[in-house]
Amino acid sequence: MKDSVIRKLEGLLERNEEVLALLSDAGVIADQERFRALSKEYSQLEDVVSTFKSFQQAEEDLESAKEMMEEDDPELKEMAQEEYKVAKSAIAALEDELQILLLPKDPNDDNNCFIEIRAGAGGDEAAIFAGDLFRMYSRYAESKRWQIEVMNTNEGEHGGFKEVIAKISGEGVYGKLKFESGGHRVQRVPETESQGRVHTSACTVIVLPEVPEAEAIEINKADLKVDTFRASGAGGQHVNKTDSAIRITHIPTGIVVECQDQRSQHKNRAQAMSVLAARIQAVEDEKRRSAEESTRRNLVSSGDRSERIRTYNFPQGRVSEHRINLTLYRLGEFMEGDIDCVVEPLIQENQADMLAALGEG
């Protein structure tokens, strides 16, 4: 491993010990904000520090095995050769692990997220599929013990949703779900299809990180147009008699957010503002990323939200992830929320791409 990397790891080890000492300091414990920040830093350092300690131990084992191999005793020599192989293999694996742990972290990975699912081409079938996708993500969230809160729905005439927006809260939510942004295509025989023909429909999924209040960009109230209206259910029928639903338009960007799933106008307004902040932040982030990456686009990009990223083929029980050429024949389990079989390879591909970029640099 490069000396510069070893020095960086030694610095992190030193910082970890400093943070640990500070966490037991009475003054820090009394300052809850500082205590929380240091606790978060300690948990972020934990993995890399523990892996580096294992790496140091493996290097010691290697040196010890080398010394034993100089012995005259044939049995000791044989044992030392075996220990040398084990240590060498451990060092190689731990080096790879440390490289990944040292990759630049997306600052939003630990944030909660908003997930927006919209029916595209395919009419009723697209809306039904949007409902299926929402159920899939809900099941996945439950399996991770995350909280899911519906913020706005526009139901389809024959089931599912023309649009559904939800907030998912929990540990590392955005980091897991961010690569779900893009076009999702379904191929299946609709229940109303008497000839048994396969129809193709599509939905768009957008995943945005929640912007913590302390980091939220300031939104000028003069830039907002706020409309109130009655919340409605499927087919447009009104489900309450007060104007509790909220529509907020951000005039400079043209972004429009509606929230109608809460009974009070105050709650709908608060939720609409948090979604609006996330969308405006996403626009700003996209501008910055485009400027930074004008010469190079990430392989597992979630930038082009219209790009088809995945196909769900029901007759074949197949799910195909187009960005990494991965095809799995376990669609039933996938639609029940067992999606780590695609989520994890996407994260790994992104890490490999970042490592390659560092190598090029």
Curated annotation (Swiss-Prot):
Protein origin, superkingdom: Bacteria
PROSITE patterns attached to this UniProt entry: RF_PROK_I (PS00745)
GO MF terms held by the record: translation release factor activity, codon specific
Stored SUPFAM superfamilies: Release factor
GO cellular component, one term: cytoplasm
Modified residues (N5-methylglutamine): Q237
Broad class of the protein's primary localization: cytoplasm
Subcellular location: Cytoplasm
Protein modification: Methylated by PrmC. Methylation increases the termination efficiency of RF1.
Biased composition annotated in UniProt, kind: Basic and acidic residues: 286-296
Region (Disordered): 286-305
Keywords on record: Cytoplasm, Methylation, Protein biosynthesis
Function: Peptide chain release factor 1 directs the termination of translation in response to the peptide chain termination codons UAG and UAA.
Family, per entry: Belongs to the prokaryotic/mitochondrial release factor family.
NCBIfam families, A to Z: prfA, PRK00591.1
Protein name, UniProt field: Peptide chain release factor 1
Source organism per UniProt: Shewanella pealeana (strain ATCC 700345 / ANG-SQ1)
